[in-house]
Amino acid sequence: MIYHDTIVALATPSGAGAIAVIRISGNNAITIASEVFQSVSGKDITKQKSHTLHLGHITDGTKVLDQVLLSIFKGTNSYTGENTIEISCHGSTYIQQQIIQLLLRKGCRMAQAGEFTLRSFLNGKMDLSQAEAVADLISSDNEAAHQIAMQQMRGGFSNEIAKLREELLNFASLIELELDFAEEDVEFADRTQFDDLLNRIEFVLKRLIDSFAVGNVIKNGIPVAIVGEPNVGKSTLLNTLLNEERAIVSEIAGTTRDTIEDELVIGGIGFRFIDTAGIRETKDVVESIGIKKTFEKIEQSQVVVFLFDSSEFKISGLKLKVALEKIKNQFPLKPLIIIGNKSDKLSETEIQNIKTEIPEILLISAKEKLGVEDLKNQLLSFVNTGALRNNQTIVTNTRHYDSLLKALDEIQKVKFGLQTNLPSDLMAIDIKQALYYFGEITGQVTNDELLGNIFANFCIGK
């Protein structure tokens, strides 16, 4: 890929709208824009300052394509670190295409996915983890995911890694110095201080690695499986949570024959609710497939909500307990919320009887929207948001997680070497490898394949 030519792309979502923004970046961005833009003030945009806005027209020869606002960002003062022009035009798809085609004829080429942010990284405007956070910020759809992406984009994660890397690099330099003076048997690196540093690095790495369990589900939404027998109100509960008729609601048992999935933000955390087919013995082939999928979805979920008809507890209480035991035995580590629906039909005596039989039960009425807030609070209780509240770094990226695991392994090798008086030259190998994995996270160590994989996930105009 050539990184020194001038690229163009639509920066706003494709399709018609009130306005669209077309972004140009490269050494010749301002010159190319000046060939198609006529300012109403008559000013030459090649002579204007950075961060200025100009009203004018995009023209193709004598043909006026649109009246636009043109923004100028020069060199290192731009997002990409090179001359950048942003053209705000009317949102007609025809106008967008005409302007982009005109710019292509004038010497631009179409940007590849994520190329504007890639150039920002290559020009030192941000490191690799910050660049990845840009994509996370764009795709964030809840407060927690937004907060994590913003912190990472502002350098919170990068600074932690950079600090660890710098301290380790200082000791690595002293170890290398010892190797240069090996014949004199001199220790430049204080072993006690080195051990303290390794313990500190190990502690931070373990904290970051542990945070991935929370960060990954926050980024992608916490999957919650709603399970139970047919016609106990699973679809009604899902619709109540989502405030819309998302699932099929019918008096006919077994009408939800497949899994239905939707998202809801509770307390700033995204939850993916999966309304599954009911669990029961059946000869219906279609429904049997749905029941099989139910157990697959339970396996994939973080939390299981088991729902039953509390008004039928007298009749089906024993069968209910058997079903609960089956889920508990098959998924012993899954957080389980037991909900008795249709509680508005119960007397006080019946309520007390059910609570005696199942102390952990939460009684609700999905139809009447009673107890739904209690359910939301229980769901939140399963998410460790302490790190969020304390503004600690939370890892959400699988690539970062993998590099952290590898770095931790190397640090533990160095610790073992220190404890067993391993020769400095052998310890130096593990230290260099740990430094490599730190650099892999921030982009100090990269290759074309890695960059290609990362930026291919971006939209074209970013």
UniProtKB/Swiss-Prot annotation:
It holds the Pfam family MnmE_helical. K(+) binds at N231, S250, I252, T255. Coiled coil: none annotated. It is found in: Cytoplasm. Keywords: Cytoplasm, GTP-binding, Hydrolase, Magnesium, Metal-binding, Nucleotide-binding, Potassium, tRNA processing. It comes from the Bacteria. Residues 221-384 form the TrmE-type G domain. GTP binds at residues 231-236, 250-256, 275-278. Its cofactor is K(+). The keyword tRNA processing applies. GO terms for biological process: tRNA methylation; tRNA wobble uridine modification. (6S)-5-formyl-5,6,7,8-tetrahydrofolate binds at R23, E86, K125, K462. It is an enzyme of class 3 (hydrolase). PROSITE patterns: G_TRME. Its EC number is 3.6.-.-. Mg(2+) binds at S235, T256. One of its GO terms (molecular function) is GTPase activity. GO terms for cellular component: cytosol. Exhibits a very high intrinsic GTPase hydrolysis rate. Involved in the addition of a carboxymethylaminomethyl (cmnm) group at the wobble position (U34) of certain tRNAs, forming tRNA-cmnm(5)s(2)U34. Belongs to the TRAFAC class TrmE-Era-EngA-EngB-Septin-like GTPase superfamily. TrmE GTPase family. Homodimer. Heterotetramer of two MnmE and two MnmG subunits. This is tRNA modification GTPase MnmE. It comes from Flavobacterium psychrophilum (strain ATCC 49511 / DSM 21280 / CIP 103535 / JIP02/86). The gene is mnmE.
